[in-house]
C-alpha cells in the first residue's frame, strides 16, 4: 500500500523550532530545508536539515550549526520531553514535500514516482519542474510536458544522476 503524496506543513512544534533557530542558522550562512519532530520507537528526534545557496553541505557544516542550535534549544527549552537532535543535509536527492521546496526547485531536474504506470509505461518520470500548485506539478521531459496530480504520486525528489 502506497501513501498518497501531500504537501506538508509544519506542525506547531516544528514551526516553533523553525522560528526559534532560523536567525541562528541564517547568521551562519545556511538555510533551513526542513524541520521534523518525529518519534521512532521509544525516542523522539528533532531533525534539522540545512542547505546552502552557494555550496554543498558537509559534515563540518552540520557540526558548525549543531552547537549554537543545541545551545539555543537548551536555553529556550521549547520542547518539554527529551529528544535527540540531528542536524544534516537533505542530500543530493532531497525530498520535495513543502511549498518552499517546490518554489526553490523550479527549473531543477526531479524524479516523480506514481502509484501506477504513467503514459510511458514507467512508474517513475524524470523531468524539469516547470510549475506547481497545491494540486499538481508540471514536468518537462524531452518528449512532452506532463501535469501530475499529487494524488497520483508517492514522492517527488531532486534527481541526481550518479555516474
Language-model region placement:
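Short Lys/Arg-rich amphipathic alpha-helical segments
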Residues: 1-126, 130-163
